[in-house]
């Protein structure tokens, strides 16, 4: 399980989209967003609602008017990009004229015991770690993670789990531990 303030994820069901044209296949996927009540099932209903348009060869621009922003549109948009790249024999970055470059990946530590959170943080090899917190053992959890990863840039995300008073209490303590940002 992966826990944040007020919610625990026990599975991630995914909508997979496959589009085919001229023996080329474009693929896209999305998990949806729980706080918008998106699920694989609801995204599938949305995707199927424009099946006719997809079969007639809808493009990315038209897609923006056919579906609202969300997981279904994202999965189809990714499949359209992938298909266009394969049909043209170019990469996405060549199609967009954006040079590829290295990016910093952020791994997230979900809410768990001090020991598990520290062990998960220690196992990450990324320079930035996002730590999910609720309103319990906040300082202790961050101290354990900082001890496990003294080299990491740490960002805290409490998902609206703190009051303003809690923020005022923890902010100076977290600053002393080198926390880069608190996301509320």
Regions flagged by a language model, labelled:
Residues 1-154, 161-168, 172-175:
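N-terminal capping/lid subdomain adjacent to the active-site entrance of alpha/beta enzymes
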Residues 178:
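Conserved functional loop/turn residues at catalytic and ligand-binding sites
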